[in-house]
Regions:
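Short, glycine-/Ser/Thr-/acidic-enriched flexible segments
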Residues: 37, 57, 64-65, 80, ...
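A short, structured beta-strand-centered segment in the mid-to-C-terminal lobe
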Residues: 399-405
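Sec/Tat signal peptide C-region and signal peptidase I cleavage site
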Residues: 16-20
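Distinct, well-ordered alpha-helical segments
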Residues: 177, 293-305, 363-376, 399
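His/Asp/Glu-enriched, well-ordered alpha-helical/loop segment
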Residues: 217, 344-384, 388-389, 394, ...
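Bacterial N-terminal signal peptides
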Residues: 5-15
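Divalent metal-binding segments
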Residues: 23-33, 38, 42-301, 313-344, ...
């Protein structure tokens, strides 16, 4: 009898830790201690502890001054650098999330052999016969060879899988891919090259094979990629309408890697959200490129969606980066005829808006139209903005500042170089000029097809003014490391009306933060070139660890 009682007590004692663990299984509370936590708040405080409870920041300050729930998980950072979760105020994450095949991001490669090594590593993990792809966010300038890889190079790297290697325009494939595309009637050169319509047709053929499950897998890869670099919120700026998209009621289409069916392109993001597997916050802006004065697509969006509809993981936030066709000779005085009518409609319905611009003439035309709209419907409370902004004049800065317009600046010139820049001028954007003007400024990438998504490469360009070849192309417009990071965090929530929720580590805000692999703020430890090697070792979204490189 005594033996049985002793055994029962022993069993119960062994079960206590398991019971305690089960009792805490509900908890999302997280405490990070002994870090250099850069809050990016108005005082730019650096503290040692942050605690997140129920998805929101509950305490920021010195270690040991906050009462903890017994179920709070504590992580000792041992002096590591912590920053708020990064926000990209203008990208095309949704396009990235639905790339066909098993995609490889080659945006950080510096040579063709390095890119081929990335493809080879990816091929080791994909099912037999599956496509290995690299679609967008690179140009031949990225590689020291300054060219596309050849069919032979792709075959050597990935002989057992078809490959599609495409930039914004030309593409190349390997022997297995060539055989497939030619069976579809798509012309492929002897060296694997696909040019013009052939490249678009090849991409369309791959997309036609995708199932929803394929797209969901691609979306999971896309979010895992950005979370490794600490990007916790993407402000997505939509897609061009692909030829053949139904129910457009307007004939504007634009084939290529920047295009998709505008109605179904969000399926995989919605699926992840419904399954509670969306780990990066996504804010959606809706493109319209209606050619007619009736503005059918824009009108459908405005009538059938609600501003700010959604939750704090997925939300519809605005209209942009277009409201009407934008392929005009702006310098020659040609403008889209329905542009003002489109923007008047957007303002009337109370939507946030952001406009793409690639020249001074485009910036000036946009600003003049914003002033006309503002005279009818004040837009300051709507947080309208102008995007990209390679050049701008002082008068336009002051005019936009006066009506509450912001500037969303993007480093696509890192890949593109100084081509198209007026002689003797910085390539842009004018980061320092706009920052010093006092107008609201934020930063992002415009990635998804033409620019690098890795935010630390974008920040490198902001700090150094150097492009992917090492050439100084944006002299005089460099900003400090602290300014660059602030533009990528605390200053970006404004563009989608969530400045009080995101962008800094402050009590009450959503618990998004990143533990870095090195001290970004110390140039003695991280050189300017070393900024490109910054990554996350721990990414937290709403108190959940969504990327863990500390294990």
């Amino acid at each position: 009898m005594r033996i049985s009682a002793f055994l029962m007590i022993a069993v119960l004692a062994m079960a206590v830790p398991a019971v305690a663990q089960d009792a805490c299984s509900w908890s999302r509370d997280l405490r990070l201690v002994n870090g250099n936590i850069h809050t990016m708040d108005a005082q730019n405080r650096v503290v040692n502890e942050v605690t997140i409870q129920e998805g929101r920041i509950a305490y920021v300050g010195p270690v040991g001054k906050h009462k903890l729930d017994p179920c709070t998980r504590t992580i000792n950072l041992h002096g590591r650098t912590v920053v708020p979760g990064l926000i990209d105020d203008h990208n095309h994450f949704v396009l990235f999330s639905q790339r066909p095949g098993y995609d490889v991001m080659v945006e950080t490669a510096t040579s063709i052999p390095e890119a081929m090594s990335m493809l080879k590593d990816r091929a080791k993990t994909v099912p037999a016969g599956a496509w290995v792809t690299a679609i967008g966010d690179w140009t031949p300038r990225l590689f020291k060879e300054n060219r596309l890889p050849t069919l032979a190079e792709l075959d050597a790297a990935v002989p057992d899988h078809p490959v599609f290697f495409a930039t914004f325009g030309p593409a190349v494939t390997n022997t297995l891919g060539k055989k497939f595309f030619e069976s579809k009637g798509i012309a492929v050169g002897a060296n694997g090259a696909l040019a013009g319509p052939a490249a678009n047709a090849a991409l369309a053929a791959l997309r036609q094979m995708q199932t929803l499950e394929d797209k969901i897998r691609s979306a999971e890869y896309a979010q895992s990629y950005v979370l490794r670099y600490g990007l916790t919120t993407s402000v997505d700026m939509g897609v061009f309408a692909d030829p053949g998209s139904p129910d457009l009621q307007d004939d504007f289409t634009f084939p290529g890697i920047a295009s998709a069916n505008p109605w179904t392109v969000y399926q995989q993001i919605l699926a992840l959200d419904h399954q509670h597997k969306l780990n990066e916050r996504v804010r959606l802006f809706m493109i319209s490129m209606d050619k007619t004065m009736a503005l059918p697509l824009l009108t459908q969006r405005l009538l059938n969606l609600f501003p700010d509809f959604g939750d704090n993981m997925l939300r519809v936030s605005g209209i942009g980066e277009f409201a009407s066709p934008w392929f005009s000779n702006f310098a020659g005085g040609q403008h889209p005829a329905n542009y003002e009518a489109a923007l008047q409609l957007v303002a009337k319905h109370g939507w946030t808006y952001q406009q793409h611009t690639l020249s001074l003439a485009e910036v000036q035309f946009t600003a003049q139209t914003y002033e006309k709209v503002n005279a009818v419907t004040p837009i300051a409370s709507l947080h309208w903005s102008i995007a990209h902004v390679p050049q701008i004049d002082p008068q336009t800065i002051q005019a936009m500042k006066a009506i509450g317009v912001g500037m969303a600046l993007h480093g696509w010139k890192y890949l593109q170089g100084a081509q198209g820049t007026p002689a003797g001028q910085p390539a842009g954007p004018p980061y320092r000029t706009l920052l010093e003007s006092g107008i609201h400024v934020g930063a992002g990438s415009d990635a998804g097809d033409i620019s690098i998504l890795d935010p630390w490469y974008e920040i490198y360009y902001m700090v150094t003014g150097k492009d992917c070849t090492g050439a100084l192309i944006n002299p005089g417009e460099q900003v400090t490391r602290e300014q660059a990071l602030r533009m990528y965090t605390a200053d970006n929530g404004w563009f989608f009306h969530e400045g009080n929720e995101l962008g800094s580590i402050e009590s009450g805000k959503l618990g998004d933060l990143v533990v870095l692999n090195d001290n970004y703020f110390d140039p003695q430890k991280v050189s300017d070139e070393g900024i490109k090697q910054i990554k996350s070792v721990l990414t937290v979204v709403g108190g959940r660890v969504v990327y863990d490189g500390l294990r």
